[in-house]
């Protein structure tokens, strides 16, 4: 039997697509191997969001070639899309496919085996107008199922290469989204994470449909789903209609990831972001009024070209005032090919790092403050895996619906179920909890008693 091994770099979308590509290989009769093992085919799903992403991708490609010099080396993903010639120039690379036409991969492998000539299967992503259907009925290693709902982005922020790697925004057919959500729930997943390159932009390319309608339909039509999480949504996409759906639903979780990138209007303008801080504040206030206890996490880029200490403090103070529950903080790094990389006034690395540390310290403090509201409360978590960072045995880790990481003493069979846990000690990066009961057992018991 032919064997295949995968390595995925980068974001949730890439992980989702690797699972989809694995389905294609599985249907063709392949067996999956670990990337460290010898396989007939190696598929490397690459990332290009930073120059480091490119570098890491090249390292992994070379590792696969060393692993089995006779294997077929197939490179796909964002770096493959933006720099196919660069990848084809690596001796030992056999096939390059970008961020579309993934279903052609198996055909290319057969063709390569016959002709022994490297194949560049990358086409112009900017011409793609239709969402490429790739199904994932189950995941290899995760308790939360990702569900990709759209592709591409029309924003062209000055720091970002992604539209060139993923093309313009294309939304997935809503019926396909609902069908796959049902499939995932039927396969046993309790939580579905809606994901995409620009997730909240879903429906912007459709006439009479939008993201709020999709959320509403997922909420009412998918039987048995316990949690629906939005991986990321822009402030400009949080319409009053979206807020109404969130308010109505008891399945859409009390957590939103809203990338802010900067809290300074002048920096946002240089970044070519589509909102002002006044607008962002208005959306946050509206959300928190409709959804008490809402956890808001965010991404921040520190040290964007020209960022002054005053502009940085605008960001710092905005985040402090609006009590975000956690931040992902990134020092700005030049991405070759973007307008920001050519801007003057690049910020000194030491200044960047010092600002990053200040924001991370604020994030840790805010995360603890947010979690402390829930001390001694009983919350529902979905255990994901054994917790390895402790000497104590039988410790497991999972997330509440409002994205608090909780560690508690439990058993292996609780993984993937909904479990009630009392928060004993709030903290960061995780909270300490005490097992109360498994929710499914409670439901079964209730049904037994009432029958």
Curated annotation (Swiss-Prot):
Record SMART domains: Elp3 (SM00729)
Annotated TM spans: none
GO biological process: tRNA methylthiolation
Domain Radical SAM core per the UniProt entry, residue ranges: 139-369
Residues annotated as domain TRAM: 372-437
Cross-referenced NCBIfam families: MiaB-like-C, MiaB/RimO family radical SAM methylthiotransferase
Job description of the protein: Catalyzes the methylthiolation of N6-threonylcarbamoyladenosine (t(6)A), leading to the formation of 2-methylthio-N6-threonylcarbamoyladenosine (ms(2)t(6)A) at position 37 in tRNAs that read codons beginning with adenine.
Protein name: Threonylcarbamoyladenosine tRNA methylthiotransferase MtaB
Organism per entry: Bacillus subtilis (strain 168)
Primary gene name: mtaB
């Amino acid at each position: 039997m032919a064997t295949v091994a995968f390595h995925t770099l980068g974001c949730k979308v890439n992980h989702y697509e690797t699972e989809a590509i694995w389905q294609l290989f599985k249907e063709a009769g392949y067996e999956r191997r670990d990337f460290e093992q010898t396989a007939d085919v190696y598929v490397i799903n690459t990332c290009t969001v930073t120059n480091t992403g490119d570098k890491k991708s090249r390292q992994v490609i070379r590792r696969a070639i060393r692993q089995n010099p006779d294997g077929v080396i197939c490179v796909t993903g964002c770096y493959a899309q933006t720099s196919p010639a660069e990848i084809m120039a690596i001796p030992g690379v056999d096939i390059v496919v970008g961020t579309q036409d993934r279903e052609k991969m198996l055909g290319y492998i057969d063709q390569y085996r016959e002709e022994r000539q490297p194949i560049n299967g990358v086409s112009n992503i900017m011409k793609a107008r239709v969402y490429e259907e790739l199904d994932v009925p189950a995941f290899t290693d995760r308790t939360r199922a990702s569900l990709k709902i759209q592709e591409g982005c029309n924003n062209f922020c000055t720091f970002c290469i992604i539209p060139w790697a993923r093309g313009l925004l294309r939304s997935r057919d809503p019926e396909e989204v609902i069908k796959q959500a049902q499939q995932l729930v039927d396969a046993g997943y309790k939580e579905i994470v809606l994901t995409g390159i620009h997730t909240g932009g879903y429906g912007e390319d459709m006439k009479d449909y939008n993201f709020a309608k999709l959320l509403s339909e997922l909420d009412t039509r998918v039987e048995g789903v316990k949690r629906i999480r939005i991986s990321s949504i822009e402030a400009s996409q949080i319409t009053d209609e979206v807020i109404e759906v969130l308010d109505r639903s008891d399945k859409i979780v009390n957590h939103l990831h809203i990338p802010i990138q900067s809290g300074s209007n002048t920096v946002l303008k240089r970044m070519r972001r589509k909102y002002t801080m006044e607008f962002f504040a208005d959306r946050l206030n509206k959300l928190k009024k409709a959804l008490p206890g809402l956890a808001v996490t965010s991404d921040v880029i520190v040290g964007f070209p020209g960022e002054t200490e005053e502009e940085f403090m605008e960001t710092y103070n905005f985040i402090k005032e609006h009590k975000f529950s956690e931040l992902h903080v990134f020092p700005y790094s030049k991405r070759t090919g973007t307008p920001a990389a050519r801007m003057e006034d690049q910020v000194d690395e030491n200044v960047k790092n010092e600002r990053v540390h200040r924001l991370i310290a604020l994030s840790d403090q805010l995360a603890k403050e947010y979690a402390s509201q829930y001390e001694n409360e009983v919350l529902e978590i979905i255990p994901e895996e054994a917790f390895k960072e402790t000497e104590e045995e039988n410790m497991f880790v999972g997330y509440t619906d409002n994205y608090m990481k909780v560690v508690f003493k439990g058993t292996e069979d609780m993984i993937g179920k909904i479990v009630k846990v009392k928060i004993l000690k709030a903290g960061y990066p995780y909270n300490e909890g005490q097992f109360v009961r498994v929710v499914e057992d409670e439901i079964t018991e209730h049904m037994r008693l009432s029958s």
